[in-house]
């Protein structure tokens, strides 16, 4: 399971790769988003088709199309070099694969659109790195999806997409991208050499926020009160995971003390 996906939605404000997630405006059924449920079994990689258009523009365009019907295409996520925008829940169908109303691409694949920066290698590299990190989170959340089930839009309809990878822009091709996903997956699965020993901390401030992950960028899910003691079972960047499974708290010396 991924701690960055909750109820088939990315956690708003969390970090994936170089990007901050924007997921506080999930589309309801409309002209572009059909509202059918699905069990995702693959991920489809797209390019948006226009250079230097920021992800927020595509995010807003999908909202506009869903409301007024000027276009029926839809997709789950737009990846930019600094933001990841989710528009459709991962357990809902989006019209992105072009293989028809009942095609496996449309009905069972998570569609990821990627911003294009054909003249900016650094931005484009970050887009692909963010995408690889996102794919790993999706693979953790939906174990049926493995590396073989991350496919190009071309796989479904023979459309020349994702264009930049298919045409090796900046030397980045499909083989390179799949290795990027593999490397990201291995980095998050790397076993720790030291066994962690749980310990107890006492809260020394009036209220201490509990968050879904080890950073203030994660969603707040509760509070702990001054004087109470809790067991920490994992550490990450001076944050501690609560034994209860509720979430993470800061381990800063002005917030907690070891018992």
Label every PLM stretch briefly.
Residues 49-53, 82-85, 90-95, 116-120, ...:
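Solvent-exposed loop/turn segments at secondary-structure junctions
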Residues 1-26, 32-37, 115-197, 259:
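Basic/polar, cationic surfaces and motifs that engage anionic cell-wall
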Residues 214-219:
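Short alpha-helix capping/helix-loop boundary micro-motifs
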Residues 187-209, 223-226, 235-236, 257-259:
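SH3-family beta-barrel domains
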Residues 221-258:
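SH3/SH3-like beta-barrel superfamily modules
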Residues 1-105:
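N-terminal catalytic cores of peptidoglycan-degrading enzymes
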Residues 48-49, 105-106, 110-120, 136:
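Cell-envelope and extracellular/periplasmic
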């Amino acid at each position: 399971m991924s701690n960055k996906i909750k109820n088939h939605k990315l956690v708003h404000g969390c970090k994936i790769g170089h990007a901050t997630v924007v997921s506080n405006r999930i589309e309801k059924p409309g002209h572009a988003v059909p509202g059918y449920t699905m069990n995702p079994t693959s991920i489809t990689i797209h390019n948006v088709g226009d250079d230097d258009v920021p992800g927020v523009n595509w995010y807003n365009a999908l909202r506009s199309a869903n409301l007024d019907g000027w276009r029926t295409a839809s997709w789950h996520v737009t990846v930019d070099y600094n933001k990841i925008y989710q528009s459709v829940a991962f357990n809902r169908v989006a019209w992105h694969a072009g293989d028809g109303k009942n095609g496996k691409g449309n009905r069972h694949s998570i569609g990821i659109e990627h911003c294009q920066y054909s003249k900016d290698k650094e931005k484009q590299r970050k887009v692909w790195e963010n995408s690889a990190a996102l794919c790993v989170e999706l693979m953790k959340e939906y174990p049926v999806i493995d590396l073989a089930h991350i496919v190009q839009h071309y796989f479904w309809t023979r459309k020349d997409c994702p264009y930049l990878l298919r045409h090796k822009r900046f030397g980045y091709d499909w083989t390179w991208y799949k290795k990027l996903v593999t490397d990201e997956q291995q980095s998050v699965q790397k076993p720790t050499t030291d066994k962690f020993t749980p310990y107890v901390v006492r809260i020394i401030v009036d209220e201490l926020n509990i968050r879904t992950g080890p950073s203030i960028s994660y969603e707040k899910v509760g509070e702990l009160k001054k004087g109470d003691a809790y067991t920490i079972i994992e550490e990450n960047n001076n944050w501690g995971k609560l034994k209860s499974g509720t979430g993470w708290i800061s381990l800063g010396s002005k917030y907690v003390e070891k018992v």
